[in-house]
From Swiss-Prot:
Residues 37-56 have a biased composition (Polar residues). Residues 101-112 have a biased composition (Basic and acidic residues). InterPro entries: GlcNAc_Synth_fun, Vertebrate-like_GNAT_dom. GO terms for cellular component: mitochondrial matrix. Residues 537-706 form the N-acetyltransferase domain. Its EC number is 2.3.1.1. Residues 1-44 form a transit peptide. N-acetylglutamate synthase involved in arginine biosynthesis. GO terms for molecular function: L-glutamate N-acetyltransferase activity. The gene is arg2. This is Amino-acid acetyltransferase, mitochondrial. Belongs to the acetyltransferase family. Gene3D superfamilies: 3.40.630.30. Residues 37-58, 96-121 are annotated as: Disordered.
Amino acid sequence: MSLHTGWPRTVNSSFLKKHRSSLCTCQHTSSVLPRSFSTTPDRHVQQSADFSSTSRSYDRLGRRAREKLLDREFFLSLLSSATTKREAKSYLARLKAQHPKSPDANKPEPEKSATAPTLPSGVNLGSFYGASRSVYESPVFRQGPSPSAPPSLEPVERLHLALVRLSTPQSLDDNIIDGVAKTLSQLNRLGLTCCVVVDPGTEGVASALRQVAIEQADRLAVAIQKQPDSKSLRLDSVFSIDPSRPGLPQVFSRKALLNPLRHGHTVILTPIAYTEDVPRAIIVPANDAVIALTKELAGLASIPDPDEDPMVTAERIGRLQKEVSLDRVILLDPLGGIPAFNRRQPSHVFINMEQEYDDIENELLQAREMVPATETSLLKAGPNSVADNNPISKFVHAEVVPVPSGSTPELKTAVPQRSAIEGHLENLRVAQKALAMLPAASSGIITSPFEVASSAQTSPTSEFSAVGTRRQRNPLIHNLLTDKPLLSSSLPMSRRGPTNNGQGAVYPVTSHTTFVKRGMPLTMLPNPWTEPWTPQSRPRLKLDDPSIDLPRLVHLIEDSFDRKLDVQDYLNRVNDRLAGLIIAGEYEGGAILTWELPPGVEDDGSEASNARMVPYLDKFAVLKRSQGAGGVADIVFNAMVRSCFPNGVCWRSRKNNPVNKWYFERSLGTWKLSDTNWTMFWTTPGLVEDSQKFRDYEAVCRSIQPSWADDTGVVD
């Protein structure tokens, strides 16, 4: 039975979609919906329509009002997740580009006439010389195959997906599950369809884990089904495995997986694979299921025939990759984001895998060795029983993300038997393996279901007034809109100060969400770990060194500043005072840093001269196509202030530079230089208290002459 016609309201309304899905979804029973409709009450309503038209109109008005309220709640959540209007517009532009109109969409369709055929001259002869209508419509029996229309050559619209792994949902209460379901529903409405893998954990026998996985998948499906304009479906028999060859499971049918996703369903999978020889259900690690799905959705699952032409193989894989774009890999784990032991923050905000993966993995491995063997008992004892001088122990006691106010699940059941650090290692590794198979534009998010659910909660004042305190940003919605983490990774901890949550409680703005990118390699010349950047370093690096691609560096500067550089004049100025160079990726971003002396101080190499040298950021550039996305600026800035110049650096910027807000947030201080168009910034601690050093910084920022070829017309 189809519900596409016969209703007075549009089929896209939440009311109709809700009940249409109850008839079309094969995996759910009537328990999915809070109500069921029988035919008898419907006939009774139809017979009494003349006497209850007023009540029916009120009912229709109430339903429309409820739908408007739900839409308003959705858009408020959407707008609150974007930090700026520019980011919201940028997302809408990307969404429009993902759904281009076909070139024939605006062409009027030719009218189909029910009349008889015409002569070539266009004269309609009616049915006089033609067969009657009954002859035209009579069935035709053919011995051979019926002629079929040629297949449509129009490309299938690309499906944008998020692959989600939800860990131990049995430890989460209904409020958390509902909040996660609401967020997944909102992602679907924003054009990012979700495929969820339920991870029951590793505690228990295989048969019990299979049952838990099925029950929790149904539980999440019901929660999603309750959301407006949402459909969910639990798929069975998705994975197959060869017991004779241990390894990753495989997706049994790509078509069976993609069809419900194309129809707007949130598909929920259990990590259960079936053996190929004798059908037998086997529980597999959820991370293996995530990797197998990533491999399939990336078009890399098929094994090429050795005798097949490589061009044919590449073309076949290319067609598969054009069908699906796996944009996000989302790991929802009660552990939250990847912890940062060496920094003054609870977790890594952003991880550039190409640059940081090995270091963070080694950091976690070292932390695991330091965890005491009695960690399970310590976890139950609480954080007060841990010595304050052991940062690793502090982390082990607080590895589960604090639950927001208003939610009080039993956190002790969310602590898995494996160590917390081992869980973070698995999250880091599965994110790295998945992103390695995906395009550079794809990204990963590691966060807690508590954080997602708390940001999805409806504000108590939203039903009455749109005026109120800005709600907490949803990390998943925010990342979809901006392709950025909730907090910039280059933002100092002092800038993540306390804020008011609208109820009188003050809490620190910290993020337990880690944003992960395959990223780009980072090159620092010279390597500050082997050759620290000091004024005494000799000989100094030069920009025309063979290890530097000068033409690409010049293009980076000119593209970023939108101005032509006087290359020779610039080389003459910086080559004898270059401190180092930072390059992100294939010259997508970079920084040129120098040692500068105040006017009147001679560079004679003496200790007094070296003591007066000022660490100066001469050029900070990011290609236009990489600005505002991908974290290129954060990667370069972090390398500068953490690795190259940890004791501080200064730079200047024109007072009307739109990037100054970004500089203000990341500097320790600023100073507007009088009688100039410059503002000085610095990250040096205690600079204001050191009057001599402050005067040197100011003198350098005043005295440096620009090296632009088109310097006329721009007042510096």
